[in-house]
A protein has these predicted regions:
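Chitinase-like catalytic core of GlcNAc-active glycosidases
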Residues: 96-121, 125-295
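Extra-cytoplasmic beta-strand recognition segments
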Residues: 449, 495, 505-539, 567-571, ...
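A broad "non-catalytic interaction surface" signal
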Residues: 731-916
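Extracellular fibronectin type III
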Residues: 712-728
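Extracellular carbohydrate recognition and processing domains
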Residues: 547-579, 592, 849-865
Length: 965
């Protein structure tokens, strides 16, 4: 069940508000964050068709409610308008390319089907960040119109189109849905309207209402060739064109690898109706079908069409060995756009990321994409020549990081970088990727972990354009640049600069088209050196005006300590009306051999001031999803008051944020009426989810939302809702394992029941220890207890002595099925320095298994490992951890989610008289301590004179240490 709180009551409206929350909600029986069970494509589209017949372009609130769609509807909407791309081929870093060639990433949006890409507390999620080369994104893992609005926000702010979901049709797996779909969409109009098909206008209106860019098809059935299927989509595309809906498209994938005069009419378009589809041509024998490009080009030209929306298909799993030379060896081949596909519930980029813990895994995920897009050197100025052997894409674990794509020329060798940063100041980034192990505000942790792609900042135009000083065309690598989640100023990530340079390096981050519409241009920059005392940063912000080759350098100066520091710096040389074309950083020459600097916030602004729409009175609704004695998780909806603004509401029921001067919304929290206000999230959506906010059970929680103007200074008043704590008995929160969490996060192509039944550890014994292990079981002790496949054998303690040699025997259960530890990697770890991690070089004590194949010895007869305890192992409590994870996926290391895995821990004690090694410093030791300050521009307001009135409780279920409502 759920409990809802709102501030007062709202007057009923004839048409649905833009946010689906202004109502008294019935209790929900869903124990999940999002409930998509009421969603049925035909019913949704039927609503839009009926609305159009009634003279409206979108349904009423009551009509949506009639099919069960209420609060969660806003999570599939994006109010972020797609930004225009600023093109100038003369400014592209790589010149020997077709500057108009386009890349379509037909990939999943988030890890998992259904709601994987929606806001959550899953830090180790997919934060794709190469929108700067991507024209179109496919959202392959969602049904029609169900792609997460948070991902569409991220795509649109970077100028990328994104479909709202996909329909699958496969002739070998036909459950009747293909015929039902054909019957539905090809229903003819009988009421004399302008359209031949009953639902053609509904398709367009629905996409516009939800804020996405159309529909995607996996057409491996038969209906895509029929005249009515083609005719329907031709009419849909014509309607979108006639209504001037920019970016609307229809993706079409079939098994055809090329176009011909005979198939172009149903795969792409014709001279009478124009281009109907974004056409994804199939790969052939799992490789780019370059041989078909000349014939495809001829067929397109013969039909009088353009090549703008024809893409040759590439199977992403084969990124490291495809016909890249052949696809780029003449002008005909270079005219062909490329689409990368792979695969159904997670992208291959995300699947093949590697690391020893979630933070390093996320860091290496970004580096893997940087190699794929910018080239092996992670700099578009220095790339291997285009070749057909890019280096290994899939590797076993983090020890092979340097082998991944180490000969990649990168997509930068084939496509121009893209920028949508404009048209006027201000510009701001917190280098947020859209997730974090913790949520930071001005360097201090407020809660965590979190995931929300709507909070991903505009990505850098270049990853990473490191050059010599004052020369954008000369490659340099003295300074390394990388994203990190170890620390942040605001949100969950920052960039780290490291290395050594005597002459200095420039890091050109963004190409822009930012006009200073007012005077007094200034820069805000937040950095962290990690050094005590006063130290020179040797760091400047650099700006370059349009029409100039000279950089304007704005030095940061010194830091006064090891914590985050922010400064506002005056900029001279940019007058009102002038345009900033490039923004970057400069590390000036330094004698330090280990330059280290975190950059967490960069803003370039002027005196522009724009009033923002406030929230509509009493519109904020908060739904409590989980609660313990120490934390609260909430889902929120709200609606801005756009009545005084000129908006497109009457067209499609959509109000874009830029129409009401909204850049984003801040989510605020306070514990008790007099408590300190904390920022716990940001979003561009009109809804969000914030999980695990810490607070005492006795305190009343206050959740607030305010809008932030496009001037990034003006804010609306905060609208607050008071949430009294549940008065019944709440569970204590799960005690955090200081060694970090290891659990099964995916069952791969198996089932949960089979994994629990068949994947478990049968025996772990030792010899030679002071106190040996003798763990032996005949079934999975987690069956019926936990689905996480992690077992702490607390009653089996291993005691060892410094310098002692011991032998560990490990045997997995031999299930005789494909769900078995036989098909896993198995790694073993011991903490030797007492810092509650396993990251020292000698703390990985054994690795077993083979990439993409089984290892029978894991289950029969079992593994044997002999180790010597280091003489300097720290005496005291320790831990033995053994982690199994699918051998077709990189091993996650000692912490993080496994695939079809099983993890087991044993308590340890190390004895001896030798001095123990000093505990290695971890990233948490370097974070700023203390409580986060209050958000800016609060001006003493409380806004909580009124409190929530609808505070009835429904039933509560307690499971896994959490109360779910």
């Amino acid at each position: 069940m759920s409990k809802f709180y709102k501030l007062g009551l709202m007057c009923a409206a004839a048409l649905i508000p833009m946010s689906m929350m202004a109502q008294d909600y019935p209790a929900s029986t869903s124990s999940q964050i999002y409930d998509q069970t009421p969603w049925e494509n035909f019913k949704v589209l039927e609503l839009f068709a009926k609305a159009y017949d009634d003279g409206r372009n979108y349904p009423t609130k009551a009509e949506f409610e009639s099919i069960g769609l209420t609060m969660d509807l806003e999570f599939v909407r994006s109010h972020t308008r797609q930004r225009p791309i600023y093109k100038d081929a003369s400014k592209d870093i790589v010149q020997d390319i077709n500057h108009d060639r386009q890349l379509w990433c037909n990939l999943p949006a988030g890890y998992g089907k259904g709601t994987g890409g929606y806001p959550s507390t899953e830090f180790d999620q997919d934060v794709f960040s190469f929108w700067n080369y991507t024209n179109l994104y496919g959202a392959w893992n969602y049904g029609f119109l169900l792609a997460p609005g948070a991902w569409i926000d991220a795509a649109h702010k970077n100028g990328t189109r994104m479909y709202g979901g996909i329909a699958f049709f496969e002739s070998w797996n036909d459950d009747g849905s293909e015929g039902a779909f054909q019957k539905f969409i090809t229903t003819k109009n009988i009421n004399g309207t302008d359209y031949a098909y009953k639902y053609s206008r509904a398709f367009v209106n629905a996409a516009a209402f939800f804020g996405n860019d159309g529909y995607n098809y996996n057409s491996e059935g038969t209906i895509y060739q029929t005249s009515d299927f083609v005719g329907f989509h031709a009419e849909v595309k014509k309607i979108a064109n006639d209504l001037n809906i920019l970016g609307f498209g229809i993706g079409q994938y079939t098994m055809n690898a090329s176009l011909s005069n005979s198939n172009i009419g149903y795969l792409y378009g014709d001279s009478q109706r124009g281009e109907i589809y974004d056409c994804m041509l199939n790969y052939s024998a799992n490789m780019l079908y370059y041989r078909g490009v000349p014939g495809t080009t001829s067929a397109v030209e013969a039909a009088g069409l353009s090549m703008d929306n024809v893409y040759q298909g590439h199977l992403l799993v084969g990124l490291d060995h495809d016909y890249w030379i052949q696809m780029n060896n003449n002008d005909v081949q270079k005219r062909m756009n490329i689409v990368i596909w792979g695969e159904h519930d997670q992208s291959r980029f995300f699947q093949f990321r590697i690391g020893e813990d979630p933070l390093s895994t996320q860091s290496n995920y970004q580096k893997l994409m940087e190699k794929a897009f910018s080239g092996a050197n992670r700099n578009p100025l220095s790339r291997p020549e285009i070749n057909n052997a890019w280096g290994k894409f899939q590797v076993a674990d983090a020890s092979q990081a340097n082998e991944q794509l180490n000969n990649s020329p990168g997509f930068a060798s084939m496509f121009a970088e893209r920028t949508a940063i404009g048209p006027s100041l201000p510009f701001e980034t917190n280098f947020s990727l859209g997730n974090g192990e913790s949520y930071f505000y001005k360097g201090k942790v407020t809660h965590g972990p979190w995931y929300n792609m709507s909070q991903q900042d505009i990505v850098p135009t270049y990853r990473w354009l490191v050059t010599t000083k004052n020369n954008m065309t000369t490659y340099a690598n003295d300074i390394n640049v990388e994203f990190t989640h170890e620390d942040a100023y605001i949100a969950g990530s920052s960039i780290r600069l490291s290395g050594s340079t005597s002459a200095g390096n420039d890091i050109v981050l963004y190409r822009t088209n930012l006009k200073a519409t007012e005077g007094n241009v200034k820069v805000d920059l937040a950095v962290k050196s990690g050094k005590e005392g006063t130290n020179a940063t040797n760091l400047s912000v650099i700006l370059r005006k349009q029409g100039s080759n000279a950089w304007i350098e704005v030095p940061y100066g010194t830091t006064s300590g090891k914590t985050w520091e922010a400064k506002t710096l005056e900029v001279s040389g940019i007058a009102k009306g002038e345009v900033i074309e490039y923004i970057g950083l400069r590390v000036n020459g330094t004698t330090a051999s280990d330059y280290q600097m975190l950059v967490g916030h960069l803003r370039v602004s002027d005196d522009r001031k724009v009033n923002v729409a406030p929230l509509r009175e009493n519109s904020l609704v908060v739904e409590v999803k989980e609660e313990t004695t120490a934390a609260l998780s909430v889902k929120l909806n709200w609606e801005p008051n756009y009545d005084a603004f000129s908006t497109s509401i009457d067209k499609f029921g959509m109000v874009y944020n830029d129409e009401i001067n909204v850049d984003h919304f801040e989510i605020l929290f306070k514990e008790g009426e007099e408590g300190k206000v904390r920022e716990v999230g940001r979003t561009a959506q009109w809804a969000t989810y914030i999980g695990n906010i810490p607070l005492a059970q006795t305190a009343t929680a206050y959740i607030g939302v305010r809008a932030v103007s496009v001037d990034l200074k003006s804010v609306s008043p905060v609208q607050w809702v008071a949430i009294p704590r549940y008065q019944g008995e709440l569970p204590e929160p799960e005690v955090e394992d200081l060694y970090g969490k290891t659990w099964m996060s995916s069952v791969g192509n198996g089932t949960l029941a089979n994994c629990i039944e068949n994947i478990w550890v049968e025996k772990v014994t030792t010899t030679g220890a002071t106190q040996n292990l003798n763990y032996q079981v005949t079934s999975n002790p987690l069956k019926g207890v936990s689905e996480e496949q992690y077992y702490f054998a607390k009653d089996h303690k291993l005691i060892v002595e410094q310098g002692q040699t011991i032998t560990i025997n490990y045997k997995g259960y031999n299930s005789g099925t494909s769900e078995s530890l036989q098909y896993d990697f198995v790694n073993a770890y011991i903490d030797y320095d007492g810092n509650y991690s396993f990251l020292d070089a000698d703390e990985t004590i054994g690795k077993f298994g083979n990439l993409n194949q089984g290892t029978m010895a894991i289950v029969d007869p079992g593994l044997e490992l002999t180790i010597k305890i280091p003489a300097d192992a720290k005496p005291g409590a320790s831990r033995l951890r053994i982690v199994g994870s699918d051998a077709w996926t990189p091993h996650p290391g000692p912490t993080g989610g496994t695939v079809k895995g099983y993890s087991i821990d044993f308590p340890m004690e190390i004895t001896g008289n030798n001095p123990g090694r000093k505990a290695a410093e971890t990233y948490k030791d370097r974070r700023d301590e203390g409580e986060a300050e209050e958000p800016e521009n609060m001006d003493g307001e409380s806004g909580i004179e009124e409190v929530g009135v609808n505070t009835a409780f429904s039933s509560v279920t307690v499971a896994n240490g959490v109360a779910t409502f």
